[in-house]
Amino acid sequence: MFERKIINDPVFGFINIPKGLLYDIVRHPLLQRLNRIKQLGLSSVVYPGAQHTRFQHSLGAFHLTSEAVQQLASKGNFIFDSEAEAVQAAILMHDIGHGPFSHVLEDTIVQGVSHEDISLMLMERINKEMNGQLTLAIQIFKDEYPKKFLHQLVSGQLDMDRMDYLRRDSFYTGVTEGNIGSARIIKMLDVKEDHLVVESKGIYSIENFLTARRLMYWQVYLHKTSVAYEKMLISALLRAKELASKGVELFASPALRFFLYNDINKETFYNNQTEQGSACRGAGGLQELAEGRGPGAHPLRRGAPHPQHARRGHRHRAHGQDPLQPRGAGGCQSGDPSAAGKPCGEDGRDGQGLSSAVRLLRPMGVPFVLFG
């Protein structure tokens, strides 16, 4: 008997998830984590309705991929059940490596490590847990499988990822120009020489797709206010890393603190090492902290301070001091006794570069929980 889980999606209606491998992926904590990651990052400052998550997007992309596989098979393109399941698994996990605030953090607190790199690492980790059941899905994700059109459904110029985020982002922002005819496009898909193609009568739908994508970038993804908020967040994080490198004690959640006080790049990320000591070393510790686990990690409510800092933050606020500023009499808290009472940094700044940006971002809960 065919068992399935039915999820009611506001964009596509009922989404069927077969019990078994795909359902196990959906239930996995690493995918469920995406319920706490907004799809559009800071765009909600412009479009208050843009509160949807990357988990919702992953389910939508899965639904479109299922429709596309059925359509391609109906046109005589032979697709094994194992291949269909693998490409569905790949699209479910394609964004599993995303952190908060969309792409803002990728080149700010971690250098040279993209969300695709992290997605692949987490896929391989889940694959080990599932005794190799995701090997084919990983091959498709990495474009190492002979049937190239399967990878193009996951990542390409006309992939199911783009089709879902255009429709979903249009729905939640209210920008109707992004509402594409995804059903029509999928019906026009076919395979020629192992590559995804579109029938000639679907050319106008593709033109509308390209136009909609351009308009969504113009009106939503690159909106001047959203970009300005992203720049402020980047400035705050870069300033925080600068202060952390000088030994200044900063107010941060355990996970964010790990990234601020350790130089994480692609080499250290994959070599399971960090140059500086921390409560949790290596990629294993990095994953635990990023998931809100590990030594010193506590589950944090969005927008709430860490429990061990709550009283300290209250004390600072009672004295009119920003809890994100270095402790002490308006100066640095470092190992250098001569630094007491002096402004932080050689340039004479007292952390105002960080503080100013943080005050502007505080209404969104940004300074308190970045990885909670």
Report residues per predicted region.
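Short active-site segment of divalent metal-dependent hydrolases/proteases
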Residues: M93, G97-H98
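Short alpha-helical catalytic segment bearing the HExxH-like zincin motif
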Residues: V87-L92
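Histidine-centered, transition-metal-coordinating active-site segments
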Residues: M1-A86, P100-E106, V110-G372
